[in-house]
């Protein structure tokens, strides 16, 4: 890839990421049109804790594939959520909760990391970058596999957070008494912070503004949209590449 093209792709990703994170609720003034873009902007204008991850991600999928039928996708998400719910009780520990998620998503559901990715870890099959593609093929990459955890956590009010790293994303379960990193690309195995520090060359510093920190739902979607923008660009959808 020529240096100029690589620079543009990186710039495009950061436009998505920084625009979403730094503007916060700055999507005010949404037009009355019911377009997918405006519906997504309306969702992102909500308080971060009120954002419905499922609705946002399905809208992003519909923007890629307007003929998408979301009913079977919502049905699958409901099945996964209910299966996790049945394994939990009010007394479930952090480890038991993480094990329930791992069991349902990977062992029962069969969701795994796709082996068809580019040097950045982005799926070569563009559908597998989106929620709908992962739910159909049961193959995804670090971002949407993590998003599956976060959707279930959102529905069950579990203390799950997305965590961004350079060219990677994982899930963290965190309360006052427990902190567990969940690696969705390796069937939900848990790793200490030191594993990620060594592999990705970053320090888990509480003072860091983005990388290694627990992200809210708006920030998580911002990180995801950076990848979506690159996929639109690579597939010559330039009008969609800048949201």
Residue ranges and their predicted role:
Residues 2-13:
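Bacterial N-terminal signal peptides that target proteins for export
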